[in-house]
Amino acid sequence: MNGTEGPYFYIPMLNTTGVVRSPYEYPQYYLVNPAAYAVLGAYMFFLILVGFPINFLTLYVTIEHKKLRTPLNYILLNLAVADLFMVFGGFTTTIYTSMHGYFVLGRLGCNVEGFSATLGGEIALWSLVVLAIERWVVVCKPISNFRFGENHAIMGVAFTWFMAAACAVPPLFGWSRYIPEGMQCSCGIDYYTRAEGFNNESFVIYMFTCHFCIPLMVVFFCYGRLVCAVKEAAAAQQESETTQRAEREVTRMVIIMVVSFLVSWVPYASVAWYIFTHQGSEFGPLFMTIPAFFAKSSSIYNPMIYICMNKQFRHCMITTLCCGKNPFEEEEGASSTASKTEASSVSSSSVSPA
């Protein structure tokens, strides 16, 4: 083994010189230059500085404007709630620990930070699954006369939290565990050890199969069918140009959200799987730290995509920020009318396959 295993931690360094210490009790400056912890803290501060306002604004604007409270937007709001959960439960913890150079908050803090990051990431993934299924059902119409309504959206939100909890809760009760990883100032699932009594191997296989591979397969299937349906409908000109444009805009927005999720989380998942399948192999602290903290940036992607690509929401947001007036009223209003992306309009006038 090319690391040092201790009670509830694994340091990616052999303790041949006796410098390795518990990441709950001592600064880990022997792993990397102390300046790296300052950079990490600054990065987390940036994510908090951007992530909190943009996700809070998404929630506030939707509550402020009744016309935005559509079934599809319930799922998008669920993403914002998950991101805020990560900001408060994970980012604030990590910025504090990185300032000290070790996980000063102890085992309880490690569980809170690891749970928050895992739950937020899983809610985001399963929300994208629900969005993909919604797009597939609305556009491809595998169920005739089906309309995605408020009850379906509420069930979809409840489903995302249930599935996310099924992944994030078990390590709190002994099926695997959360331990410090990388530079030892953030926590994640124990991919590193075969510690007795925790069944890490079975949990990691369960997590990768049921909470990563299967949801991604569902997403790819739905969008594969959706792309074919949109092309067929466009060729047959079965729907009006306005309807087709609205469908394309909503679909494009959700696809970009999926791509941004993959860009954020696949590097982390790939490195975690490599470490799990090569336990005991040599790797440095940055090997896991960089993809782990890159994945955390996903908390600012989805609301930015939503704001940039949903013209109606952007119009309402500007109105809210400018005290009820939109200085770009003519441009935003015209665009919003021409290509409305409300779920209600999407559901009632959807593109069907030829």
UniProtKB/Swiss-Prot annotation:
GO terms for molecular function: 11-cis retinal binding; G protein-coupled photoreceptor activity. Keywords: Cell projection, Chromophore, Disulfide bond, G-protein coupled receptor, Glycoprotein, Lipoprotein, Membrane, Palmitate, Phosphoprotein, Photoreceptor protein, Receptor, Retinal protein, Sensory transduction, Transducer, Transmembrane, Transmembrane helix, Vision. It is found in: Membrane; Cell projection, Cilium, Photoreceptor outer segment. Residues 334-354 have a biased composition (Low complexity). A motif ('Ionic lock' involved in activated form stabilization) lies at residues 134-136. GO terms for cellular component: membrane; photoreceptor disc membrane; plasma membrane. The modification N6-(retinylidene)lysine is found at residue 296. The chain crosses the membrane at residues 37-61, 74-96, 111-133, 153-173, 203-224, 253-274, 287-308. One of its GO terms (biological process) is absorption of visible light. Disulfide bonds join 110-187. It is a multi-pass membrane protein. Residues 1-36, 97-110, 174-202, 275-286 are extracellular. Belongs to the G-protein coupled receptor 1 family. Opsin subfamily. This is Rhodopsin. The lineage of its organism: Eukaryota, Metazoa, Chordata, Craniata, Vertebrata.
